Amino acid sequence: GWQAGITGYYDEKSYCKFGLRGTENGTLAELTVRSPEGKTVVRSAPAACGTLRMEADGLTRRFYLDDTMFAELPRAEFLADEGRGCQKRFTGSMMGLYAVGADFTAKFGELSMENYTPDWAL
């Protein structure tokens, strides 16, 4: 089936995917985490198509379907190597959009970034 959504990505072993996917029984909203410890579906629920949003606040990631919080990852350390000793090549994560499959339309619209000053810089 089809899939479309948002991903927080560090590498092929460290990412989260929040999206909608078509199944034989309808549409599901789903948050999946892949970390060095393995792959986990954090939450999966029937949903109508809607607007997806991911907010990042330090290590916390919040995921919204329309204006309702779908799930929260309070400590998403798997998206960075700081303090983990993972021997990765750089520190930093990316955010991306994905759409795969047929017979659907994915519209990617707004990216909003606000000024952020980490606590250590104050």
Range-by-range predicted roles:
Residues 1-122:
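Extracellular glycan-recognition regions
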